[in-house]
């Protein structure tokens, strides 16, 4: 029995669901009035909490009275870089009209019939379990960073009969001897909503980027497979020319879609990659300074998922680069000897267009590929080593 072939809506479910966690509805799904109001209130609370936390953090940095050791300096450096990274990605996904437009174009192009979906092997391009687990682990490790302090406080209460009132971020100062408990609860609520805004913006934007890139890659593979399977002949030249004309049009359309994708995500992609590398560096150094603690353990998991996050963006960027070039190879290997001159002219058009590689790029000039990932990790390692030497 053939497995059920995934629809376009099935692909969209993961990125849409992730953004729902912070109350942001990317595709404008119809909702009841009461549900719309609840979403709006929750969205407002996340943004307001984020604004308050960033404001307090900036105040503490300007005041500079409470940042009195290397560990705190690295903690603040981590927070600043992560906020820049997350806010950059959030600004990107605010281009909702452009994202919805690209989504509609790809939905129209998606294989409609079951046989067509089988031919394009859509199920092979669906979100793998390992990717879904990566997203869950990333969000889970981020949650642990936030709730870790209160867990530590609860453990201290049961082991030493003292609740230590620890919380996540160092820029909120709480004195249990002077301040009422409701302030502690308010601080934790602010930190939770602030973290939700940052974490979901960070991972969610990349999932939308990968979602669109996977769809474009799927269609490039479809072109390559179609060329490999088709055998033209002068005996059915009319049908052959219709076939190859569709391939030419689809190639042009895919280039246009990739340009749309770069137009949405490319402007912020360079800054996102640089700040992600900075986050990895500062978190790694902070974790090494702190030593083996619950916080350190959750940060190690966070670093691992952040590295994988960058790797996947570069991996799919490499894929579209390779696949767009493989279209020309598919034409070279195409059995066109019995085809008409007109058919061969179409093939020449495809080859000429394939000479200009289609790529995921940052700001129009930096191609995102596995080489980018290697360079980024190499620089990150050198920065971590340099920072540790400076501290020691």
Curated annotation (Swiss-Prot):
Source taxon at top rank: Eukaryota
Sequence intervals crossing the membrane: 37-57, 70-90, 131-151, 180-200, 269-289, 296-316, 364-384
Residue positions with a glycan: 69
Biological process terms in GO annotation: detection of chemical stimulus involved in sensory perception of smell; signal transduction
A Pfam family that the UniProt record links to this protein: 7tm_6
Membrane topology annotation: Multi-pass membrane protein
Tissues where this protein is expressed: Expressed in olfactory sensory neurons in the antenna.
Single GO molecular function: odorant binding
Residues exposed to the Cytoplasmic side: 1-36, 91-130, 201-268, 317-363
Family annotation (InterPro entries): 7tm6_olfct_rcpt
Residues on Extracellular side: 58-69, 152-179, 290-295, 385-392
Entry keywords, A to Z: Cell membrane, Glycoprotein, Membrane, Olfaction, Receptor, Sensory transduction, Transducer, Transmembrane, Transmembrane helix
Cell compartments where the protein resides: Cell membrane
Gene Ontology CC: one annotated term: plasma membrane
PANTHER family: ODORANT RECEPTOR, ODORANT RECEPTOR 13A-RELATED
General remark: The atypical heteromeric and topological design of the odorant receptors appears to be an insect-specific solution for odor recognition, making the OR/Orco complex an attractive target for the development of highly selective insect repellents to disrupt olfactory-mediated host-seeking behaviors of insect disease vectors. Odor-evoked OR currents are independent of known G-protein-coupled second messenger pathways.
UniProt subunit comment: Interacts with Orco. Complexes exist early in the endomembrane system in olfactory sensory neurons (OSNs), coupling these complexes to the conserved ciliary trafficking pathway.
Purpose: Odorant receptor which mediates acceptance or avoidance behavior, depending on its substrates. The odorant receptor repertoire encodes a large collection of odor stimuli that vary widely in identity, intensity, and duration. May form a complex with Orco to form odorant-sensing units, providing sensitive and prolonged odorant signaling and calcium permeability.
Family classification: Belongs to the insect chemoreceptor superfamily. Heteromeric odorant receptor channel (TC 1.A.69) family. Or49a subfamily.
Name of the protein this chain belongs to: Odorant receptor 85f
């Amino acid at each position: 029995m053939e497995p059920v072939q995934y629809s376009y809506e099935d692909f969209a479910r993961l990125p849409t669901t992730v953004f729902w966690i912070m109350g942001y509805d990317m595709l404008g799904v119809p909702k009841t009035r009461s549900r719309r109001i609840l979403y709006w209130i929750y969205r407002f609370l996340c943004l307001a909490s984020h604004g308050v936390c960033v404001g307090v953090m900036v105040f503490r940095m300007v005041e500079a009275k409470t940042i009195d050791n290397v560990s705190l300096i690295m903690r603040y450096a981590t927070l600043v870089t992560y906020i820049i990274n997350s806010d950059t990605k959030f600004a990107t996904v605010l281009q909702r009209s452009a994202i919805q437009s690209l989504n509609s174009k790809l939905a129209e192009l998606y294989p409609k019939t079951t046989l067509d979906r089988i031919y394009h092997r859509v199920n092979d391009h669906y979100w793998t379990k390992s990717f879904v687990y990566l997203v869950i682990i990333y969000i889970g490790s981020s949650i642990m960073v936030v709730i870790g302090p209160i867990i530590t406080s609860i453990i201290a209460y049961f082991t030493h009969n003292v609740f230590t009132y620890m919380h996540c971020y160092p820029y909120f100062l709480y004195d249990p001897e002077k301040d009422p408990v409701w302030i502690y609860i308010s601080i934790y609520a602010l930190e939770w909503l602030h973290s939700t805004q940052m974490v979901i913006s960070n991972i969610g934007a990349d999932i939308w980027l990968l979602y669109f890139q996977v769809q474009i890659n799927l269609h490039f593979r479809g072109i390559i497979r179609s060329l490999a399977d088709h055998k033209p002949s002068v005996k059915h030249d009319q049908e052959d020319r219709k076939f190859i004309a569709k391939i030419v049009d689809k190639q042009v359309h895919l280039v246009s879609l990739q340009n749309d994708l770069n137009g949405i995500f490319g402007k912020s992609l360079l800054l996102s990659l640089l700040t992600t590398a900075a986050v990895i560096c500062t978190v790694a150094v902070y974790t090494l300074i702190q030593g083996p603690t619950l916080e350190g353990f959750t940060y190690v998991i966070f670093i691992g998922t952040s590295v994988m996050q960058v790797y996947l963006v570069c991996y799919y960027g490499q894929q579209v680069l390779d696949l767009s070039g493989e279209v020309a190879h598919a034409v070279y290997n195409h059995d066109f000897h019995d085809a008409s001159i007109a058919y061969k002219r179409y093939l020449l058009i495809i080859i000429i267009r394939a000479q200009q590689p289609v790529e995921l790029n940052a700001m129009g000039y930096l191609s995102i590929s596995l080489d980018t990932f290697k360079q980024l990790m190499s620089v990150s390692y050198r920065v971590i080593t340099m920072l540790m030497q400076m501290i020691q």
